[in-house]
């Protein structure tokens, strides 16, 4: 069965999702997923140009053009390009036979708003961000076993939660987490200013390419949604840094059981080669952020940075906050599509 997908919001994540899915399909994975339509407020000529040319991912190898004013042609693939401004309920998902909507505008993250996609004829909605009042938040490899097909509005959490989740799961399963604090050293995003200017967050008001910008992250608290046993036990913040992609999570946790550096690294390696294969990757090489750009894993564990004092452990994991997350988005569409 083909899983027909509509994408609402063809920005950084929407376009990365398209490219990640195309890469997976070329490798023989998730070949039953078809993107049939995208919707964005931006004109379609601009969308086609930004899909073809990408400052991080480079040029798309296929030719990209417009057919008429409502179809983007990518190689021999045609995608309906909508410009519906009235909100999810006004989208023609029913007429287009869309099964799953990827909601990636960053606007309709509340379930009441996202429900408009269901009213418009879609069967499932996946929000590519932390959400409110959603039926379930899923981090693949951590709690995807909780999806039973009855949930219609699903959050794929954040890129940082997708990195932190596997780390926290392994630590908690093997040694127990009493409490912990995390920092994500995160690439800048569109929610920051290129130059100093007004912003509701006065730190993010400052020039993104010139500063290390401390700001909030909900990733640590969101862990409680996917690992309920850790609810209220983790907290942290983000440091936005002047790079376009490639981020890293630093977690310091008090463990219930004492463990050595070797114990922790062995547990992470076993998980990366076993139940979390494809989600968690184990590195013992001395890598830097550019080394993990376009790596499809959610979390790339850096064994050389593990530290332990008594029962306090520090673990570090890298992630491509765009590409890794977009690959999980494609995998979540596949999981949800199987229940249709």
From Swiss-Prot:
| Enzyme Commission identifier(s) | 1.2.1.12
Active-site feature positions? 159 (nucleophile)
Q: By its UniProt entry, which SMART domains does this protein fall under?
A: Gp_dh_N
Give its localization. Cytoplasm
Instruction: Please tell me where this protein is predominantly located.
Output: cytoplasm
Listed Pfam families? Gp_dh_C, Gp_dh_N
A GO molecular function held by the record: NADP binding
The organism sits in which domain of life? Answer: Bacteria
InterPro entries linked = GlycerAld/Erythrose_P_DH (IPR020831), GlycerAld_3-P_DH_AS (IPR020830), GlycerAld_3-P_DH_cat (IPR020829), GlycerAld_3-P_DH_NAD(P)-bd (IPR020828), Glyceraldehyde-3-P_DH_1 (IPR006424), NAD(P)-bd_dom_sf (IPR036291)
Q: Which UniProt keywords apply?
A: Cytoplasm, Glycolysis, Isopeptide bond, NAD, Nucleotide-binding, Oxidoreductase, Ubl conjugation
Statement: the UniProt record of this protein carries the keyword Cytoplasm? yes
Assigned GO CC terms: cytoplasm
Name a biological process GO annotation: glucose metabolic process
| Position(s), cross-link Isoglutamyl lysine isopeptide (Lys-Gln) (interchain with Q-Cter in protein Pup) | 257
Q: Which PROSITE patterns match?
A: GAPDH
Question: Any keyword Ubl conjugation?
Answer: yes
Q: Which pathway does UniProt place it in? A: Carbohydrate degradation; glycolysis; pyruvate from D-glyceraldehyde 3-phosphate: step 1/5
Give the UniProt family note: Belongs to the glyceraldehyde-3-phosphate dehydrogenase family.
Q: What is this protein called?
A: Glyceraldehyde-3-phosphate dehydrogenase
The source organism is Mycolicibacterium smegmatis (strain ATCC 700084 / mc(2)155) (Mycobacterium smegmatis)
């Amino acid at each position: 069965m083909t899983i027909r997908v509509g994408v609402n919001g063809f920005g950084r994540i929407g376009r990365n999702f398209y490219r990640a899915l195309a890469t997976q399909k070329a490798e023989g994975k998730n070949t039953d997923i078809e993107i049939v339509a995208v919707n964005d407020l931006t004109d379609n000529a601009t969308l086609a140009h930004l899909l073809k040319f990408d400052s991080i991912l480079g040029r798309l190898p296929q030719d990209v053009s417009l057919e008429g004013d409502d179809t983007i042609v990518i190689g021999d693939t045609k995608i309906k390009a909508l410009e519906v401004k009235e909100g999810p309920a006004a989208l023609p998902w029913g007429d287009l036979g869309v099964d799953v909507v990827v909601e990636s505008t960053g606007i309709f993250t509340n379930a009441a708003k996202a429900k408009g996609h269901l009213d418009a004829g879609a069967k499932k909605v996946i929000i590519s961000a932390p959400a409110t009042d959603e039926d379930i938040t899923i981090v693949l490899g951590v709690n995807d076993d909780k999806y039973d097909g009855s949930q219609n509005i699903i959050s794929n959490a954040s890129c940082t939660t997708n990195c932190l989740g596997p780390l926290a799961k392994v630590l908690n399963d093997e040694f127990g987490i009493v409490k912990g604090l995390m920092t994500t050293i995160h690439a800048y995003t569109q929610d920051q200013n290129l130059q100093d200017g007004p912003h509701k967050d006065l730190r993010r008001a400052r020039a993104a390419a010139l500063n290390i910008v401390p700001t909030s992250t909900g990733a640590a608290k969101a862990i409680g949604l996917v690992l309920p046993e850790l609810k209220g036990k983790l907290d942290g913040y983000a440091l936005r840094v002047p790079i376009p992609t490639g981020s890293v999570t630093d977690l310091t946790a008090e463990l219930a059981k004492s463990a050595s550096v070797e114990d922790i690294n062995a547990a992470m390696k076993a998980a990366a080669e076993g139940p979390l294969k494809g989600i968690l990757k184990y590195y013992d090489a001395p890598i830097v952020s550019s080394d993990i750009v376009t790596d499809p894993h959610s979390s790339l564990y850096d064994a050389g940075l593990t530290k332990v004092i008594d029962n306090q452990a520090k673990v570090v994991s890298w992630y491509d906050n765009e590409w890794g997350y977009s690959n999980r988005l494609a995998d979540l569409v596949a999981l949800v599509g199987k229940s249709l």
